[in-house]
């Protein structure tokens, strides 16, 4: 972690080579939704091993431009040029933020608000917040494999509407929420720390983007008035940012974070363990668990994951 954050005094991207990467077009660096990428229409083919013949696929389609998300009363979308990142990359680089503003916000008021920073992968806009009642049917035939239920879309919409009602209620605390868009030429987020490979994203977010948002929406603008949270990759980012900028933030809630320490990378100590797939044993080979089901039962081992990851890599994942 420390190695990733503390950039070595190497050359910047602007000083090394000329890199050609697709620029951000509103898709969060997702190739399958990136405007101007081309693709074919789906076709049905028959495979006959006794009579093999070439299959003709015509590239006729192009992904259209993405319309910017419109601001609303409560949700705003901010974009700034980062001088720190632009210097590192040798071209104009930008950071964006989705901002949820509190009920009763008045720019001309002297009221100042604390800031909640939600970390994670690319968010197109503030999710889980809607100002209208749910329109999805309570009962449908769409089964959610993840949660084992139907009607999940209704549940999502209802929770989002309930959050709106809570957010605007009389006694609910007033604060700002920010989601950061820090997609880059390599991925849909930067992991929110400084990196010799990606540049000073940690500094750019902490010292350029967040103060800009706070100035625009009457934030407190001091470390004691900022809190970090996130899950999975966002959990890792929340903990990393709090670790590297202890005076700029006042706490972090890291839910199910990506591995924080390579001494406990899932069930492997990368630094010391000789075998990633089995525990050391004098008697029999004991597989290292890799995944448990909702009851806590092991349903996949590290060895099982080896084949899954290998296949995924071959597919270009």
What positions do the PLM features span?
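Non-catalytic cap/lid and distal C-terminal segments of serine-dependent acyl enzymes
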Residues: 1-317
